[in-house]
Each structure stands twice: as structure tokens, then as C-alpha cells.
């Protein structure tokens, strides 16, 4: 018996996520049994703006609350859901400064753990090229702002 080909028609999804900075550290989440490190993100709820969804998803997936510092580049990609349905996904990302909370207080639906990493280690651990690109953009913004004050989420 042959496996049916994926549908050529793609449904569309819109998500939002965030890169949280605390001093010189970045917060990542592990999924897929801890084998994949990525930025927290999730679907927009009805009537929710991307920035609101990013803050909510970061809080739900990491236990950490952050304040939006800047919008980052969006990411577009296509994937197969359950090997059958083609999904076109757009994710709006935001740079967030750490505000409060603990990375041990999250909802463990899809997330295995949340952990702080140094910038170089975070970039190296991120499993997806799109996430690495977003993280590099975020750090360029952090460096630019460090000339004005301290890093987002740092001690002032």
C-alpha cells in the first residue's frame, strides 16, 4: 500500500514568538524530547495582536514575563503536519527584556525545559536557521542599545 502524497494546497497559520534577553543571556526552550532548541512561539488567539501573543506564548512556554523592546524579522516556512497536510506558517518575532518569573514555572505541553544560555551558546544550540537569524538580529539591536544604556533585561 502506498502513502498518499501530501496535499498541494496549503493552509495558513500565523504565530508569534519572542527572544527574551536577561543581561547577556537568552532564554530558549527544548522540544522533541529535548533534542530541539528553539525560540518560544505559538498561535495567535482570536482578536490577539502578534505582540500580545508573543508575550503570552513566552510566559506560557517558559514561565517568564518579558517587556517588548523591538519587533524582529518575521519568518515564513512551509511544513507537513502529520505527514499529510501542507501548512504555510508566518511567525512574527519580538525582542523582549526579562521582567519577572522563573524558567522552571511553565506549562509542559510541548516544552521539555526552558533554559538561559549565553549569546554564543544560544546561537550554537538553536536547531533552526531561521531562529539563529532572528537571534543574531536581536543581538545587533541589543548591542546598538547598549551604547544608549544597559542591555534589555539587565540590572539597571
Features from the language model and the residues they span:
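Functional cleft and adjacent loop/helix regions within the main domain
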Residues: 40, 46, 151-155
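Residue-level signature of transmembrane alpha-helix interfaces in integral membrane proteins
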Residues: 8, 41, 79, 134-136, ...
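N-terminal compositionally biased, intrinsically disordered segments and leader/signal-like regions
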Residues: 3-4, 63, 151
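Class I (Rossmann-like) S-adenosyl-L-methionine-dependent methyltransferase catalytic domain
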Residues: 2-9, 79-82, 156
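Unchanged
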Residues: 44-133
Amino acid at each position: 500500500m502506498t502513502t498518499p502524497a501530501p496535499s498541494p494546497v496549503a493552509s495558513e497559520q500565523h504565530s508569534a514568538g519572542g527572544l527574551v534577553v536577561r543581561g547577556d543571556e537568552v532564554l530558549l526552550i527544548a522540544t522533541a524530547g529535548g533534542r530541539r532548541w528553539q525560540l518560544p512561539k505559538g498561535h495567535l488567539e482570536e482578536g490577539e495582536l502578534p505582540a500580545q501573543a508573543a508575550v503570552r506564548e513566552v510566559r506560557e512556554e517558559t514561565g517568564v514575563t518579558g517587556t517588548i523592546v523591538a519587533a524582529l524579522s518575521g519568518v515564513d516556512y512551509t511544513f507537513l503536519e502529520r505527514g499529510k497536510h501542507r501548512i504555510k506558517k508566518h511567525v512574527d518575532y519580538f525582542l523582549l527584556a526579562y521582567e519577572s518569573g522563573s524558567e522552571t514555572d511553565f506549562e509542559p505541553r510541548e516544552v521539555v525545559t526552558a533554559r538561559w544560555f549565553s549569546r554564543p551558546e544560544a546561537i550554537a544550540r538553536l536547531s533552526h536557521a531561521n531562529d539563529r537569524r532572528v537571534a543574531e538580529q536581536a543581538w545587533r539591536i541589543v548591542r546598538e542599545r547598549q551604547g544608549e544604556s544597559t542591555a534589555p533585561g539587565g540590572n539597571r
